[in-house]
């Protein structure tokens, strides 16, 4: 049973590493001028990997239960106490997960910054700056010139 648990941890680690690679592609897409076309495929792949990780976590919890251990972090930490292979793989998985978490937070901040920038630019173009002048109308035309 411990061999199956080890195999699951190895699979989780590989999946997290694949997820982290996608995050790097996502970051590049967000900062490049023509990267928006790549985002739908990246999001689709991230969704697939997230679902795979959820399945692996369930498998890990079932394997822990088969060993008479509780699920989650507590159970895996208990499994690590008696097996250096599991402890080593768990440490790798935790490290990869933390790096992916930090990268995901960075990307989230990038997206929020871009959204705020776009919101402000639209407000200026719509004349929502307090001076009452509207540069562009809702249809994208210049109302002052009838264009």
Residue locations for each model-derived region?
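Extended, charge-rich alpha-helical scaffolding segments
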Residues: 2-78, 88
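Short terminal interaction segments
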Residues: 77-147
């Amino acid at each position: 049973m411990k061999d199956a648990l080890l195999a699951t941890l190895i699979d989780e680690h590989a999946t997290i590493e694949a997820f982290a690679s996608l995050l790097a592609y996502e970051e590049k897409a967000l900062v490049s001028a023509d990267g928006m076309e790549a985002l739908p495929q990246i999001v689709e792949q991230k969704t697939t990997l997230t679902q795979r990780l959820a399945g692996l976590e369930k498998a890990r919890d079932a394997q822990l239960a088969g060993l008479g251990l509780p699920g989650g972090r507590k159970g895996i930490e208990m499994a690590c106490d008696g097996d250096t292979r599991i402890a080593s793989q768990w440490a790798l998985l935790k490290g990869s997960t933390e790096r992916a978490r930090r990268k995901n937070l960075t990307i989230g901040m990038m997206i929020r910054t871009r959204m705020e920038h776009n919101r402000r630019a639209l407000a200026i173009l719509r004349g929502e700056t307090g001076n009452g002048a509207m540069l562009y109308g809702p249809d994208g035309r210049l109302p002052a010139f009838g264009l």
